[in-house]
Amino acid sequence: MEMKWFLSKIQDDFRGGKINLEKTQRLLEKLDIRCSYIHVKRIFKDNDRLKQGRITIEEFRAIYRILTHREEIVEIFNAYSENRKILLENNLVQFLTQEQYTTEMSKTIAFEIIQKYEPIEEVRKARQMSLEGFTRYMDSRECQLFKNECRKVYQDMTHPLNDYFISSSHNTYLVSDQLVGPSDLWGYVSALVKGCRCLEIDCWDGAQNEPVVYHGYTLTSKLLFKTVIQAIHKYAFMTSDYPVVLSLENHCSPAQQEIMADNLQTTFGESLLSDMLADFPDTLPSPEALKFKVLVKNKKIGTLKETHERKGSDKRGKVEEWEEEVADLEEEEEEEEKFKESEIFESVLGENQDKETGVKKLSGVTLFKKKKTRKLKIALALSDLVIYTKAEKFKSFQHSRLYQQFNENNSIGETQARKLSKLRAHEFIFHTRKFITRIYPKATRADSSNFNPQEFWNIGCQMVALNFQTPGLPMDLQNGKFLDNGGSGYILKPHFLRESESYFNPSDIKDSMPITLTIRLISGIQLPLTHSSSNKGDTLVIIEVFGVPNDQMKQQTRVIKKNAFSPRWNETFTFIIHVPELALIRFVVESQGLIAGNEFLGQYTLPLLCMNKGYRRVPLFSRMGESLEPASLFVYVWYVR
């Protein structure tokens, strides 16, 4: 029956005789067979018996079988088929219930699957499934590891903003390093498309009274501020309906701050939040209440009540000035690092410096290299656009408990945050329950490298800001975590990071209810080949767990020699995970290297609690986050609490 169907689909393509590689590729696509060109090219060459670059219908049939026949799928099919040829509707229901843990299973669901994936009409009409149809179903999105219910917004979005992890970027305007790399609008567009909800804009005085965006004291190129926010306006809500926060690193003079304020109001219009919401005069609103809104994060003058009373008044030329303490050692170190960078480039940038006092003056903001205060000037017009995201310097947990207001947010550098998280984790978590806290990379990361964000998610930090332009493990974790909740960029924190009565400490887990996770890594499908001349397709897989310190672990398979097309491991791994709500699972595929070390081939990261049980397909992504379809892993997953 399958042979008859197969020949009916391909005969017309061979009426003119043999076909070449390009026509072979097109015919496979016509048959809905996803395949990598590099693998098809090799298989075509192996099956072209006359080595003329053209194949017969029988040779094509052999290629098709190599690409679609997977022994591991045949074994599952035969286990549930009564005659090893056809799955009856009841057989499919049994498989979905017993192996895939499909809840609320019914013949109706089984029938829908048959109608969608069974290609042979007479089998489909009989409400049955052939091996061909079963293979297509097992290779479909419905059988992916990531739960379908996590692909949509399913969490309660009516909690205050501080109850959520918020996808956040650092130096969003950069697409390379921080010293001489280009600034590019693509940095903002790309971040927004990936679901990022907090963007950083580094603002400086520009020529012709136009504020510019670039990495100060360096040779990075410049973008007009108004052009940046126009791009943000276009893409802000393309991926997510939930609020976008513009985190301004404001180095502009008051005059150009007024221009920034005008640009923001003109560009965003009603989308720009410029006053308190009536229902939230003294608490942070929820993502739901702020749908399609843009929030400005910046320094602010006075209270929200005063801002409300000034609404509609003329603010032109009105400026406030005050001295602000540089409260912590890390900030002094970072100012000094910036100061050193400015010395490197001063001949190019033409900055003026007082050699004796070590003071560098920058467009209305004076930074003191050695003193512990700095003077700030802010235009009232810009200040009044800051509502629920007022930037406030972090001084201490005690100071925050006594004086910090609900709408004041802190930004803490990674070095200081790491020290605090290790020494005073409970106080840090108490702080992040009440106040939005942003963690950013240290200034010495001139190459735009990233830290591991997991350690700061573990203590409830809402905005863990990463350099989105830099691929690697940190961005894999970022992308994996924010797959959840429909990729909305907002994930409700676990109850123990929200509730005041909780005494959770990620380094001292008590009274936990661990999950036992079992993963049987069965096989790989069309794994990518590297460009390395030494690559022989010697493949292995590493499974890693990221979460609280006690849950961090990894295990790996043996190496399958000279087979990247269809390696079979059939190895089982078990993990005990104490805090599953914070755990991420990462699959990494590598090619074994004897001299230069293993070579990265692809990876996939996702939250543990977004993992389907049963036989599942694991898609793979490149180092840059691009899909490597049809490359994937085939696994069996089981976990129980």
From Swiss-Prot:
Active-site residues, Swiss-Prot/TrEMBL: H170, H215
Cofactor: Ca(2+)
Segments forming domain PI-PLC Y-box: 382-498
CDD domains tied to this protein: C2_PLC_like, PI-PLCc_zeta
Entry's Gene Ontology BP terms: egg activation; intracellular signal transduction; lipid catabolic process; positive regulation of cytosolic calcium ion concentration involved in egg activation
Keyword Lipid metabolism: yes
Cleaved signal peptide residues: none
Reactions catalysed according to its record: a 1,2-diacyl-sn-glycero-3-phospho-(1D-myo-inositol-4,5-bisphosphate) + H2O = 1D-myo-inositol 1,4,5-trisphosphate + a 1,2-diacyl-sn-glycerol + H(+)
InterPro entries: C2_dom, C2_domain_sf, EF-hand-dom_pair, EF_hand_dom, PI-PLC_fam, PLC-like_Pdiesterase_TIM-brl, PLC_EF-hand-like, PLipase_C_PInositol-sp_X_dom
EC number: 3.1.4.11
GO cellular component terms listed in the entry, alphabetical order: nucleus; perinuclear region of cytoplasm
Subcellular location field: Nucleus; Cytoplasm, Perinuclear region
Assembly description: Interacts via its C2 domain with PtdIns(3)P and, to a lesser extent, PtdIns(5)P in vitro.
Job of this protein: The production of the second messenger molecules diacylglycerol (DAG) and inositol 1,4,5-trisphosphate (IP3) is mediated by activated phosphatidylinositol-specific phospholipase C enzymes. In vitro, hydrolyzes PtdIns(4,5)P2 in a Ca(2+)-dependent manner. Triggers intracellular Ca(2+) oscillations in oocytes solely during M phase and is involved in inducing oocyte activation and initiating embryonic development up to the blastocyst stage.
Domain notes: The EF-hand and C2 domains are essential for triggering Ca(2+) oscillating activity and the regulation of PLCZ1 enzyme activity. The X-Y linker region between PI-PLC X-box and Y-box domains may be a target for proteolysis and may play an important regulatory role during fertilization.
Official protein name in the record: 1-phosphatidylinositol 4,5-bisphosphate phosphodiesterase zeta-1
Taxonomy of the source species: Eukaryota, Metazoa, Chordata, Craniata, Vertebrata
